[in-house]
Design a protein with these regions (language model features):
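Conserved N-terminal beta1-alpha1 strand-loop-helix module at the mouth
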Residues: 1-64, 68-72, 128-130, 202
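Hydrophobic faces of well-ordered beta-strands that scaffold small-molecule active sites
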Residues: 6-12, 35-37, 62-66, 86-88, ...
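Short, small-residue-enriched loops and turns at beta-alpha junctions
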Residues: 14-19, 39-45, 68-71, 93-95, ...
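Generic structural signal for well-ordered alpha-helices
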Residues: 21-25, 47-51, 75, 97-101, ...
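Catalytic cores of alpha/beta
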Residues: 23, 69-81, 120-131, 166, ...
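Conserved anion-binding
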Residues: 72-73, 77-163
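C-terminal helical cap(s) of enzyme catalytic domains, especially alpha/beta-barrels
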Residues: 100-104, 180-181, 189-212
Length: 212
């Protein structure tokens, strides 16, 4: 898809709901395009965490990061709490992929797929998922993670289709900015804002927005 400006997904990866809301509001005020309700927040507080974060950030889109395999009912639960996107792990199961796409469409929520595969299988798995209707993907830039000499996952996604939306997650500042320059549609970061650090939040968001 290659958006004109790389979007920024701010991940709220804390356990405490009050702190999570504070971080989410800060990220919105600093210019984040998307707020991620992180896995720790959901696990600690249940699905209500999604709704509480959505109320706190208003019209800013919210992603529910379940980090589960495609499980029946997740789309309905996330949508009921106001999520706009949902992250799901996925492997080679065409029925579950097609079912997730349909359930998300029925509930007006966009599935973002995190392929669970060996690095050498990523290309084939993603190509199959695209053929089944998947449009949004999430992954680390490199495999092994953080190793630029390894497989460039972003390059694989971009080679498969210019139409898919690719989010790269990275808590390494230089890697995040380079991924934005290299064609990622969205960059997800979170470690820098585990505490409400407005200066760090602005630094990350502005650098990613200005990378292209």
């Amino acid at each position: 898809m290659t958006t004109p400006k790389t979007l920024v997904q701010a991940a709220v990866d804390v356990n405490d709901l009050g702190l999570g809301k504070e971080i989410a509001v800060m990220a919105k005020e600093c210019g984040a395009d998307l707020i991620e309700v992180g896995t720790p927040l959901i696990f600690e507080n249940g699905h209500k965490a999604i709704g509480e974060i959505k109320k706190a950030v208003g019209d800013t889109p919210v992603l529910a990061d379940f980090k589960f395999f495609l499980t029946m009912g997740l789309a309905e639960q996330a949508a009921a709490e106001g999520a706009d996107y949902i992250t799901m792990l996925t492997g080679y199961n065409e029925f579950l992929i097609e079912d997730a796409i349909k359930r998300c469409a029925d509930n007006h929520i966009i599935p973002v797929f995190y392929p669970f595969s060996k690095p050498e299988e990523l290309c084939a798995l993603t190509a199959r998922m695209i053929s089944l209707g998947a449009t949004h993907f999430f992954n680390h830039r490199y495999a092994p993670m953080g190793d630029p000499s390894g497989q460039d996952n972003l390059a694989i996604y971009r080679s498969l289709s210019p139409e898919i939306h690719v989010t790269i997650t990275s808590d390494v500042f230089s890697e995040a900015v380079d991924s934005a320059r290299s064609g990622a549609d969205c960059i997800c970061f979170g470690r820098a804002i585990h505490t409400p650090d407005r200066e760090a939040c602005v630094k990350w968001i502005d650098a990613i927005h200005e990378a292209r």
